[in-house]
Amino acid sequence: MSLKRSDDYQDLEEGIAMEDGGNIKDEEEKPLDPIEEQNKKRWVLIRAVLGELLCTFLFVYVLCATSANFIRLGSPPNPVVGGLSTGFAAVALIYSFADVSGAHFNPAVTFATCVTRKTSITKGLMYVGAQLVGSVLASLILLATFPGNFPGDKNAASAVAIAPSTDANIGNAFLTELVLTFILVYVIFAVAFDTVDNSVKTKVVGKSSSNNLTIYTTSGQTKAGFAPIAIGFTLGFLCFLGGSVSGGAFNPARVFGTALVGNNWTRHWMYWIADFLGAGLAGFAQKFFSSTHK
């Protein structure tokens, strides 16, 4: 969920902007030798992958712990509390990790960035691997922080595992996951990536004389600044939708760790295929509507 264009590596800074008497000037840095430059790029990638692992761990743990706490208290699931905790956690984590890894914490989001060529396949595979490790670690920590048996003689991980409703067929659940993931990824691509000219710092108003249609748009920088809030709100309201049908995952990392640790693989494949399909369609759809699309 990057707040900037998701290139394979950050470009190295070529100069340092320094203020001298109110004027800004560039001071050239000594070029790095090829080995040093390669090492720096490698470290940036390693840091990004580790950041994605930690970000996913925190996100999945918050969601699972919220559900586990309700179950231990004997309270029925509360979609409002679940939506708020999901949204707030997403906002905090995106602000915290956006400049480290891009804060995807969702294999479907990473897949969409790969198929739209915002992320390389190699980096995407490393991200997905890190996300799955983070998901498993979150489920293991959940067992340590919520001990004892849950209803149905389940452990904490299996108790909060997401699965389709028993009264919904596979088509209902598949389509629900696809649509919810499409909404999420479309919003992420629309607000988190540079879709307009960043050199435009102010709002642009265009008016068509033929039909009196006024179009308002904002700069990429303005949109990116509010991206964590927009994404958090989207995750929050999506929690109110589809939970009674598919379980409302729209994130394969949310279901993988609990499925592995809790040994609950009910229709697990659906959350990968439906979510990846919805994410890919959303990425291409947003690219089509983007102002930079040629």
Swiss-Prot record:
GO biological processes: cell motility; hypotonic response; water transport
UniProt name for this protein: Aquaporin-B
Cellular component GO terms held in the UniProt record: cytoplasmic vesicle; membrane; plasma membrane
Natural source organism: Dictyostelium discoideum (Social amoeba)
Cell compartments where the protein resides: Cell membrane; Cytoplasmic vesicle
Main location: membrane
Region (Required for water permeability): 208-219
Modification note: Glycosylated and non-glycosylated forms exist throughout all developmental stages.
Function: Putatively gated water-specific channel, requiring a cysteine residue within the channel. Impermeable to water, glycerol and urea when expressed in Xenopus oocytes. Not regulated by pH; channels remain impermeable to water at pH 7.4 and 5.2.
Cytoplasmic side: 1-42, 101-123, 194-224, 290-294
Region ranges (Disordered): 1-31
Record InterPro entries: Aquaporin-like, Aquaporin_transptr, MIP, MIP_CS
Induction data: Inhibited by mercuric chloride.
Residues spanned by motif NPA 1: 106-108
Site (Selectivity filter) residue list: C239
Position of sequence motif NPA 2: 251-253
Extracellular-facing ranges: 64-79, 145-172, 246-268
Documented effect of changing D275P: Impermeable to water in Xenopus oocytes
Gene Ontology molecular function, alphabetical: water channel activity
Signal sequence residues: none
Membrane-spanning parts: 43-63, 80-100, 124-144, 173-193, 225-245, 269-289
Membrane topology value: Multi-pass membrane protein
Alphabetically ordered keywords of this record: Cell membrane, Cytoplasmic vesicle, Glycoprotein, Membrane, Phosphoprotein, Repeat, Transmembrane, Transmembrane helix, Transport
CDD domains named in the record: MIP
Family named by the database record: Belongs to the MIP/aquaporin (TC 1.A.8) family.
Comment field on protein domains: Aquaporins contain two tandem repeats each containing three membrane-spanning domains and a pore-forming loop with the signature motif Asn-Pro-Ala (NPA).
